[in-house]
UniProtKB/Swiss-Prot annotation:
Main localization (coarse): plastid
Pfam families per the UniProt record, alphabetical: ATP-synt_ab (PF00006), ATP-synt_ab_C (PF00306), ATP-synt_ab_N (PF02874)
Role description: Produces ATP from ADP in the presence of a proton gradient across the membrane. The alpha chain is a regulatory subunit.
PTM annotation (Phosphothreonine): residues: 257
Name recorded for this polypeptide: ATP synthase subunit alpha, chloroplastic
GO molecular function: ADP binding; ATP binding; proton-transporting ATP synthase activity, rotational mechanism
Highest rank taxon of the organism: Eukaryota
SUPFAM superfamilies: C-terminal domain of alpha and beta subunits of F1 ATP synthase, N-terminal domain of alpha and beta subunits of F1 ATP synthase, P-loop containing nucleoside triphosphate hydrolases
Places the protein is found: Plastid, Chloroplast thylakoid membrane
Enzyme Commission number, as recorded: 7.1.2.2
NCBIfam families the UniProt entry points to: atpA, PRK13343.1
Family statement drawn from the similarity comment of this UniProt entry: Belongs to the ATPase alpha/beta chains family.
Site label Required for activity, positions: 363
Length: 507
């Protein structure tokens, strides 16, 4: 029979009493007054911070956006269908943040950085705040390195530098996303990490972009952040900041990044929906008063960091959709004033078969030739001038039938230059190929060809020069200058190919 020893029992009880730690946790809680349309009104939560995450009893997370005298307005990061009036809510004491790591490359994630591509969890040891302050003046340096898009019209006349913010603006179906995805494809082998943020788009459109990047091996250095049209407004509003946080992670690790926001009009609409439901006073076009700050705090995070911080960079290409070419609407004017230039895509040019449909006349880069290599500067100046003169003459020629020979020649040259700016989608050109193409056009080598023959000739010329005059590309790649030697190789190559092409066409 087991004997019960009182001293042993009392010792065990004493030990337990000594080990007992009386912990008091204070939780800031509140009660749901009203819920609906992705918004909840909470009574209580007295010490909640603006932008703090709050957790509902059934697990939904929300963000406290409106701090009013008698209640707190919370936007929900989910449908919130299970939230009931009178249920409890607790403040988490955290501001929205996401995990970040190299493992995100090649993945498709949502605004909360959770994978949505069905390829399992993403391991990450660090995290970053979704909203973090932009680098200050001392932390930056001026933009000086080119970020090649692979599109002749942009790289020659509207150059983009690493750390710049260049707006892509145009009506729907004018090729805005195509310009952005071509730029991602052209970063292959350039040591640039790309982040593509899809806001409020059709899931089929996002899938198309991802497939096109995968087929060409571009997903290896790309992260896709997607919140489709059926996502809650809160997540559509957060998606660009999530993308920026991921790009910043790489930028502060001395790497170059490119981020595309497709598109900010949809983000502004999601924010307008949230603000109106929170009963914030509407302003112009019913947008809230702080919609400028919504975009400025996002785009100011793009920067070229100083040498002390490792010279990393984050280049932003925000996309904005206009309604029938109206760039004077509220969101377009806001974003134009925040960015360092804009690429304007025109529906008329697109329908006329000029693709990419870039209106060179009103597109501008405020960084300019600082973001070009010397060889490109040498050939691009003449191209700009001749196209500007051609645009003027073309408008004038519509009213006049008898034009002198010089004017006719200039019009013919302009038509051929316009032809050389045309490019197929997903076929970006290297900077050496662009230089040889522009040089051929501006020096009159295309004048003897029919307009319909120009593109065929240029394709053959690029192949011919690559195989028979590799010295040209080597000189440009090493010196970044169109030297006299490189020019002589180029002239010989063009001359030889032109003779071959004309013979071939005669047969």
């Amino acid at each position: 029979m087991v004997t019960i020893r009182a001293d042993e029992i009392s010792n065990i009880i004493r030990e337990r009493i000594e080990q007992y730690n009386r912990e008091v946790t204070i939780v800031n809680t509140g009660t749901v007054l009203q819920v609906g349309d992705g918004i909840a009104r909470i009574y209580g939560l007295d010490e909640v911070m603006a932008g703090e995450l709050v957790e509902f009893a059934e697990g939904t997370i929300g963000i406290a956006l409106n701090l009013e005298s008698n209640n707190v307005g919370v936007v929900l990061m989910g449908d919130g269908l299970m939230i009931q009036e009178g249920s409890s809510v607790k403040a988490t004491g955290k501001i929205a943040q996401i995990p970040v790591s190299e493992a995100y490359l090649g993945r498709v994630i949502n605004a909360l950085a959770n994978p949505i591509d069905g390829r399992g969890k993403i391991s990450a040891s660090e995290s970053r705040l979704i909203e973090s302050p932009a680098p200050g003046i001392i932390s930056r340096r001026s933009v000086y390195e080119p970020l090649q898009t692979g599109l002749i019209a942009i790289d020659s006349m509207i150059p983009i530098g690493r750390g710049q913010r260049e707006l892509i603006i145009g009506d729907r179906q004018t090729g805005k996303t195509a310009v952005a995805t071509d730029t991602i494809l052209n970063q292959q082998g350039q040591n640039v990490i790309c982040v593509y943020v899809a806001i409020g788009q059709k899931a089929s459109s996002v899938a198309q972009v991802v497939t096109s990047l995968q087929e060409r091996g571009a997903m290896e250095y790309t992260i896709v952040v997607a919140e489709t049209a059926d996502s809650p407004a809160t997540l559509q509003y957060l998606a660009p900041y999530t993308g920026a946080a991921l790009a910043e992670y790489f930028m502060y690790r001395e790497q170059h990044t490119l981020i595309i926001y497709d598109d900010l009009s949809k983000q502004a609409q999601a924010y307008r929906q949230m603000s109106l439901l929170l009963r914030r006073p509407p302003g112009r076009e019913a947008y809230p008063g702080d919609v400028f700050y919504l975009h400025s705090r996002l785009l100011e995070r793009a920067a070229k960091l100083s040498s002390q911080l490792g010279e990393g960079s984050m280049t932003a290409l925000p996309i904005v959709e206009t309604q029938s070419g109206d760039v004077s609407a509220y969101i377009p004017t806001n974003v134009i004033s925040i960015t360092d230039g804009q690429i304007f895509l025109s529906a008329d040019l697109f329908n006329a078969g000029i693709r990419p449909a870039i209106n060179v006349g009103i597109s501008v880069s405020r960084v300019g030739s600082a973001a070009q290599i010397k060889a490109m500067k040498q050939v691009a100046g003449k191209l700009k001038l001749e196209l500007a003169q051609f645009a003027e003459l073309e408008a004038f020629a519509q009213f006049s039938s008898d034009l002198d020979k010089a004017t006719q020649n200039q019009l013919a040259r302009g038509q051929r230059l316009r032809e050389l700016l045309k490019q197929s989608q997903s076929a970006p050109l290297t900077v050496e190929e662009q230089i040889m193409t522009i040089y051929t056009g501006t020096n009159g080598y295309l004048d003897g060809l029919e307009i319909g023959q120009v593109r065929k000739f240029l394709v053959q010329l690029r192949t011919y020069l690559k195989t028979n005059k590799p010295q040209f590309q080597e000189i440009i790649a090493s010196t970044k200058t169109l030297t006299a030697e490189a020019e002589s190789f180029l002239k010989e190559g063009i001359q030889e190919q032109l003779e071959r092409f004309l013979l071939q066409e005669k047969l």
